[in-house]
A protein has these predicted regions:
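C-terminal alpha-helical interaction appendages
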Residues: 3-92
Length: 92
């Protein structure tokens, strides 16, 4: 019996008509995709990006944050209509 794979979030974006939206690649942070903005930009959850990177690369929280800040967040201003990274407000 073959087991049916759960579709990736990228696949779900394509099925919903957002195949032209810009997504991260290498790493993809697929499990951190949480939605799409009204103008069609893919929204990622920052905390889930960190968790995804830590899991995929077997690294510490600090190493994951450093990689994401330097290699991903820093590049966002140079990508027109690029992804949005959501940082949740801290609870008081």
């Amino acid at each position: 019996m073959t087991r049916k794979r759960k579709p990736t979030n990228r696949h779900r974006l394509a099925l919903a008509g957002y195949e032209q939206s810009i997504v991260f690649s290498n790493p993809s942070y697929d499990s951190a995709i949480v939605g799409v903005s009204t103008d069609g930009r893919v929204i990622y959850d920052y905390d889930l990006m960190v968790a995804d990177f830590m899991h995929a690369n077997h690294c510490s929280y600090e190493d994951a944050v450093n990689f994401i800040e330097y290699n991903t967040i820093r590049s966002l201003p140079y990508v027109p209509n690029g992804p949005i990274v959501l940082r949740k407000l801290e609870e008081e």
